[in-house]
């Protein structure tokens, strides 16, 4: 097997973005899984931040993972990969200056592209979930990311959640991110092709979708025609690994009784109930200080 350099893989990813076909990204989490993805014919892969949080912390995806922890995880994947890796840069781990550091570190880790989202993370005191930062600040992060990359082949992908704001706001946001120089726009929460058309008619850059297997957005020909070049259908491989690990350990231990479903496993072993209680206690103004 001839190894390709990180720069070469970034060029390959850029060619995917500029091509005319939609590709489904493999959700990978370690060297073996990315080698499997390559062997099975995937052209691109992603190391999800939520998956890294499960791996490293055994915690829900609530912005507990640090930049160093994520970089260490994605570096392992990057060293073994023969296909481009998309890194999940979350919110850039802070403001625009933090974004610059994030880009530098993820570039060294070998990612071919990174997504940078406009969600306010972590949640502030007494703040509802899924709050978006001002689009001017988000656009400044895109400018900063472009400034910080030393390899122009590294793709900067601006990500936004269209399900938590209005159509007009989503259009204004993506237009601003395109103007700021994003190489692609990543959309979360698109309902169907009609919604997709309304959201992207003004865009010239390629589209990436995170749709978690939405059947209304499964037609590859229509996705390709809509300028969608990358689709992420969730992170089933690692979730399946969690389920398989539990079942193997359960069999080895000889434990009897009812088997836990995957949602039950995730809730129990990521301490979800505890984190919810801690959030109610420490992130809400109504908590009792006595």
Curated annotation (Swiss-Prot):
Record PANTHER family: OXALOACETATE DECARBOXYLASE, PHOSPHOENOLPYRUVATE CARBOXYLASE
Assembly: Homotetramer; dimer of dimers.
Cystine bridges: none
UniProt record, GO biological process: oxaloacetate metabolic process; propionate catabolic process, 2-methylcitrate cycle; pyruvate biosynthetic process
Gene Ontology molecular function terms on file: magnesium ion binding; methylisocitrate lyase activity; oxaloacetate decarboxylase activity
Pfam families: PEP_mutase (PF13714)
Native source species: Pseudomonas fluorescens (strain Pf0-1)
Family indicated by similarity: Belongs to the isocitrate lyase/PEP mutase superfamily. Oxaloacetate decarboxylase family.
Function: Catalyzes the decarboxylation of oxaloacetate into pyruvate. Seems to play a role in maintaining cellular concentrations of bicarbonate and pyruvate.
Names of the cofactor(s): Mg(2+)
Binding site for Mg(2+): 88
Documented EC number(s): 4.1.1.112
Keyword Metal-binding: yes
Top EC class, one word: lyase
Catalysis performed (reactions): oxaloacetate + H(+) = pyruvate + CO2
Protein name: Oxaloacetate decarboxylase 2
Signal peptide: none
Species classification: Bacteria, Pseudomonadati, Pseudomonadota, Gammaproteobacteria, Pseudomonadales
Keyword annotations of the record: Decarboxylase, Lyase, Magnesium, Metal-binding
Sequence positions that bind substrate: 50, 159, 235
Cofactor note: Binds 1 Mg(2+) ion per subunit.
